[in-house]
């Protein structure tokens, strides 16, 4: 095949848009004339084109756009499919990736600018985020705002601060502001969490205090109920410990308080105004009903107490043999009726319950086995005084202790 003449090649180069001088063309033609071996005319033209681009690169001069456009057109996929699929010129490592080789229709005239447009002529003037198409303002425009969470905003702001460093100063300032906003959000969340923890701790302490108060109130109420039940159960079996009467939770040791004064007035009437009214009771208990290991002193133990706590003397008319005998009421009545007892008997037997004063001798004393001092001016106990624990105690003791003297004498 005959090669094209130099004039033809020169005219082709000039027609192709290459601005070259006559001297350069003549020199290139001389070079091509010497090296005309196995190259085709198309290959020679491509070689000349690349030689001109090389000269601009060596001279540190900007390459004109007219020299680059033919290369981009020549790399179209239908013509050179192997280049567009990752060939030598198609790789982005050689610097051709920014021109989107093989896609002339999708070329971006301003690669670093945000691509948000109104579909016609307007385009966003901000710089796009690195490796993104849009700026920070338009990067989330397509998402549903109603489904965005508060945590997502802070996390996205924290992520946006990292690429904003490589942007111009305006973008960098925006990134710093968004980062400070995210830090402030984290601080407010931490403060809110601490406040919630303190409120929970205060609520728990208040609930514990309220529970302890309710528990103490219930314990006090149960103590009073247990004491009244113990008094009623022990009065039925005639075995009442002296300590339970002396140390009652409601001060039932016959102290001069209004509650006990009401009990005395209900028992003996309003006409008697004695402050030291006492009653001595000695209740015998059958020994056969008690267990064998039951102490004799506990079997003969009788309740004792006085208004001042120091007057624990027993009545002079009660014989010591009555308390120590084990023959029952008839044995006590027929064995010994003496009215005096020695000091050993006084120290051996515990004091008896004194509800009437020792000096009160206006009413007759009955020599009965039970030793009940009955007054002639006895009045009935109204129901209002029995409602209290002290009133019920006085009523139970008198009703269980009063015995008709004539019935005892007939025995």
Curated annotation (Swiss-Prot):
<dbReference type="InterPro" id="IPR014977">
    <property type="entry name" value="WRC_dom"/>
</dbReference>
<keyword id="KW-0805">Transcription regulation</keyword>
<comment type="similarity">
    <text>Belongs to the GRF family.</text>
</comment>
<keyword id="KW-0539">Nucleus</keyword>
<dbReference type="GO" id="GO:0005524">
    <property type="term" value="F:ATP binding"/>
</dbReference>
<dbReference type="GO" id="GO:0006355">
    <property type="term" value="P:regulation of DNA-templated transcription"/>
</dbReference>
<dbReference type="GO" id="GO:0032502">
    <property type="term" value="P:developmental process"/>
</dbReference>
<dbReference type="Pfam" id="PF08880">
    <property type="entry name" value="QLQ"/>
</dbReference>
<dbReference type="InterPro" id="IPR014978">
    <property type="entry name" value="Gln-Leu-Gln_QLQ"/>
</dbReference>
<feature type="region of interest" description="Disordered">
    <location>
        <begin position="333"/>
        <end position="369"/>
    </location>
</feature>
<keyword id="KW-0804">Transcription</keyword>
<dbReference type="Pfam" id="PF08879">
    <property type="entry name" value="WRC"/>
</dbReference>
<feature type="domain" description="WRC">
    <location>
        <begin position="108"/>
        <end position="152"/>
    </location>
</feature>
<feature type="short sequence motif" description="Bipartite nuclear localization signal">
    <location>
        <begin position="113"/>
        <end position="123"/>
    </location>
</feature>
<feature type="short sequence motif" description="Bipartite nuclear localization signal">
    <location>
        <begin position="141"/>
        <end position="148"/>
    </location>
</feature>
<dbReference type="GO" id="GO:0006351">
    <property type="term" value="P:DNA-templated transcription"/>
</dbReference>
<dbReference type="InterPro" id="IPR031137">
    <property type="entry name" value="GRF"/>
</dbReference>
<comment type="function">
    <text>Transcription activator that plays a regulatory role in gibberellin-induced stem elongation.</text>
</comment>
<feature type="compositionally biased region" description="Polar residues">
    <location>
        <begin position="360"/>
        <end position="369"/>
    </location>
</feature>
<protein>
    <recommendedName>
        <fullName>Growth-regulating factor 7</fullName>
    </recommendedName>
</protein>
<dbReference type="GO" id="GO:0005634">
    <property type="term" value="C:nucleus"/>
</dbReference>
<keyword id="KW-0010">Activator</keyword>
<feature type="domain" description="QLQ">
    <location>
        <begin position="38"/>
        <end position="73"/>
    </location>
</feature>
């Amino acid at each position: 095949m005959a090669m094209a003449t130099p004039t033809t090649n020169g005219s082709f180069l000039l027609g192709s848009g290459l601005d070259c001088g006559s001297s350069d063309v003549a020199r290139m033609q001389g070079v091509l004339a010497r090296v005309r071996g196995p190259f085709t005319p198309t290959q020679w033209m491509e070689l000349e084109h690349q030689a001109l681009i090389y000269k601009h690169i060596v001279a540190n001069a900007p390459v004109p756009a007219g020299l680059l456009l033919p290369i981009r057109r020549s790399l179209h996929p239908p013509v050179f499919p192997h280049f567009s699929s990752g060939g030598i010129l198609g790789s982005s490592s050689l610097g051709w990736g920014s021109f989107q080789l093989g896609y002339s229709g999708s070329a971006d005239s301003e690669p670093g600018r945000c691509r948000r447009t109104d579909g016609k002529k307007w385009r966003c003037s901000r710089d796009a985020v690195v490796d993104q198409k849009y700026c920070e303002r338009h990067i989330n425009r397509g998402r549903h705002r109603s489904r965005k969470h508060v945590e997502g905003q802070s996390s996205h702001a924290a992520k946006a601060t990292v690429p904003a460093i490589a942007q111009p100063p305006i973008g960098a300032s925006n990134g710093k502001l968004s980062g400070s906003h995210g830090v402030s959000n984290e601080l407010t969340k931490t403060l809110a969490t601490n406040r919630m923890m303190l409120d929970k701790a205060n609520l728990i302490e208040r609930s514990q205090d309220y529970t302890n108060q309710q528990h103490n109130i219930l314990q006090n109420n149960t103590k009073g109920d247990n004491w009244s039940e113990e008094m009623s159960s022990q009065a039925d079996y005639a075995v009442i410990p002296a300590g339970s009467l002396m140390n009652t939770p409601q001060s039932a040791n016959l102290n001069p308080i209004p509650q006990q004064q009401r009990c005395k007035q209900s028992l003996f009437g309003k006409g008697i105004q004695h402050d030291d009214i006492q009653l001595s009771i000695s209740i015998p208990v059958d020994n056969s009903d008690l267990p064998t290991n039951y102490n004799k002193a506990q079997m003969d133990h009788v309740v004792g107490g006085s208004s001042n706590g120091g007057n624990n003397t027993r009545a002079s008319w009660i014989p010591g043999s009555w308390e120590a005998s084990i023959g029952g009421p008839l044995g006590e009545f027929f064995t010994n009726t003496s009215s005096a007892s020695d000091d050993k008997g006084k120290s051996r037997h515990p004091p008896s319950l004194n509800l009437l004063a020792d000096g009160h001798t206006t009413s007759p004393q009955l020599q009965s086995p039970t030793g009940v001092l009955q007054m002639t001016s006895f009045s009935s106990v109204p129901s209002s005084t029995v409602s209290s624990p002290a009133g019920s105690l006085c009523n139970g003791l008198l009703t269980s202790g009063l015995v008709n003297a004539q019935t005892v004498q007939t025995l």
